[in-house]
């Protein structure tokens, strides 16, 4: 492995920020991996909730795009991308739509907390460009995703999930099916 040469474009980009961006890339890829696992769980013949599958596949793609955007930023700022192993999801069986939505809500809150810590680091290192990037491309979207998942969890519970299989079928058909994956 060759050592990377110093960047000629690097300016006001602290090494702690560079390292934090690499950690955030890993977290976004992990989130994408979790959502991919969820998607194909709901696509199984014995689960057969196609709109849950579509919803989580869309989320997986979004998280991968978030990682790619951070990788592009890393290169633009003169940082170096160091990829790490992506942890596998904590489970393979997501049990129910409600359980998966609760896990997704927890995941999005963890991603959001990491972004808030990255923003604080950028503030502490006096990096207005990184602050603006996080604010513009991530923070508002995270809040909206958390709200949407919270609403989904609430509605599934009100409908009687997970005790009622009919609740998840109707939610899949009428909420996720009608929304066409609105974010």
Swiss-Prot record:
Assembly behavior: Oligomer of 24 subunits. There are two types of subunits: L (light) chain and H (heavy) chain. The major chain can be light or heavy, depending on the species and tissue type. The functional molecule forms a roughly spherical shell with a diameter of 12 nm and contains a central cavity into which the insoluble mineral iron core is deposited. Interacts with NCOA4; NCOA4 promotes targeting of the iron-binding ferritin complex to autolysosomes following starvation or iron depletion.
Alphabetical UniProt keywords: Acetylation, Cytoplasm, Cytoplasmic vesicle, Iron, Iron storage, Lysosome, Metal-binding, Oxidoreductase, Phosphoprotein
Chain residues that bind Fe cation 2: 63, 108, 142
Binding site residues for Fe cation 1: 28, 63, 66
Reaction(s) the record says it catalyses: 4 Fe(2+) + O2 + 4 H(+) = 4 Fe(3+) + 2 H2O
InterPro entries attached to this UniProt entry: Ferritin, Ferritin-like, Ferritin-like_diiron, Ferritin-like_SF, Ferritin_CS, Ferritin_DPS_dom
Protein name: Ferritin heavy chain
Residues bearing PTM N-acetylthreonine: 2
Keyword Acetylation: yes
Modification Phosphoserine occurs at: 179, 183
């Amino acid at each position: 492995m060759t050592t990377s040469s110093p960047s000629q474009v690097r300016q006001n980009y602290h090494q702690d920020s560079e390292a934090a961006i690499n950690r955030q890339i890993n977290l976004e890829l992990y989130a994408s991996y979790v959502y991919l696992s969820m998607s194909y769980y709901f696509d199984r013949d014995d689960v057969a909730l196609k709109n849950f599958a579509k919803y989580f596949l869309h989320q997986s793609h979004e998280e991968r795009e978030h990682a790619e955007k951070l990788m592009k930023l890393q290169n633009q700022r003169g940082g170096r991308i160091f990829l790490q192993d992506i942890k596998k999801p904590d489970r393979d069986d997501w049990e129910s739509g409600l359980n998966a939505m609760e896990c997704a809500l927890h995941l999005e809150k963890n991603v959001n907390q990491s972004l808030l810590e990255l923003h604080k680091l950028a503030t502490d290192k006096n990096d207005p460009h990184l602050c603006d990037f996080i604010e513009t491309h991530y923070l508002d979207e995270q809040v909206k995703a958390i709200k949407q998942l919270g609403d989904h969890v609430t509605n599934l519970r009100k409908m009687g999930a997970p005790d009622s299989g009919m609740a998840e079928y109707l939610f899949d058909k009428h909420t996720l099916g009608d929304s066409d994956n609105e974010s």
